[in-house]
């Protein structure tokens, strides 16, 4: 991450050797579409023809993990700082605070 002294909460999206792409607001991993139902709450207020996630393509290097934040328009994640190492993961999320409709323990 860009600030080594800060902790970030991100989703691991892809592993080494996998190709991650976003095309027209759809996530693809190795060419296969992947549904991100957890983003529905964020996307519902977007204007038609507006994308929540800009298009990109990334091949995860050896030993790397590709991570994305849920608030895609402003998230600092692998699109900004590249792949991360597994060793940089320090914990797992246990509780959801946002959006309010989803508050509770992670299932």
Per-region residue spans from a language model:
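Soluble "head" domains of membrane/secretory-pathway proteins
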Residues: 1-107
